[in-house]
């Protein structure tokens, strides 16, 4: 049983760092149940992955695309529905900003209001 080395694979993938990334990704794929394309020969998954790359039974380009795809994150942007946009944009029937009156509070009124607040009960988390 001959062990595969990085030297056997370097002609398939030029960059050693990229080779390690691809072999690691393929080893994780094998661990998650992906079928292997070479005889296992009692080898562990990283060795099997390197042997697959060296024997060209898996394409490094396909592995690279799959690795990139697995690392990408897709976040869904919550956009407003088309029918609600005109309702928000139009201010017909709405109150004009100049008509809004806000209550003003002095500093003394604020302090008096804060002093009237009851502190929350002490929990077990606050002790110790």
UniProtKB/Swiss-Prot annotation:
GO cellular component, one term: DNA-directed RNA polymerase complex
Signal sequence range: none
Organism: Azorhizobium caulinodans (strain ATCC 43989 / DSM 5975 / JCM 20966 / LMG 6465 / NBRC 14845 / NCIMB 13405 / ORS 571)
GO biological process: DNA-templated transcription
PANTHER family xrefs: DNA-DIRECTED RNA POLYMERASE SUBUNIT OMEGA (PTHR34476:SF1)
Family named by the database record: Belongs to the RNA polymerase subunit omega family.
Record's protein name: DNA-directed RNA polymerase subunit omega
Binding partners and assembly: The RNAP catalytic core consists of 2 alpha, 1 beta, 1 beta' and 1 omega subunit. When a sigma factor is associated with the core the holoenzyme is formed, which can initiate transcription.
Example of a GO MF term: DNA-directed RNA polymerase activity
Secreted keyword on record: no
């Amino acid at each position: 049983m001959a062990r595969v080395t990085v030297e056997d694979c370097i002609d398939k993938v030029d960059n050693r760092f990229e080779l390690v990334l691809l072999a690691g990704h393929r080893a994780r794929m094998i661990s998650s149940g992906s079928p292997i394309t070479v005889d296992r020969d009692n080898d562990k998954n990283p060795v099997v992955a390197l042997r697959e790359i060296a024997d060209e039974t898996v394409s490094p380009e396909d592995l690279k695309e799959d690795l990139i795809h697995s690392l990408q994150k897709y976040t869904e942007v919550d956009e407003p529905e088309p029918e609600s946009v005109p309702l928000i944009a139009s201010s017909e029937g709405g109150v004009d900003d100049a008509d809004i009156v806000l209550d003003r509070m002095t500093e003394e009124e604020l302090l008096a209001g804060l002093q009237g607040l009851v502190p929350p009960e002490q929990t077990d988390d606050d002790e110790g």
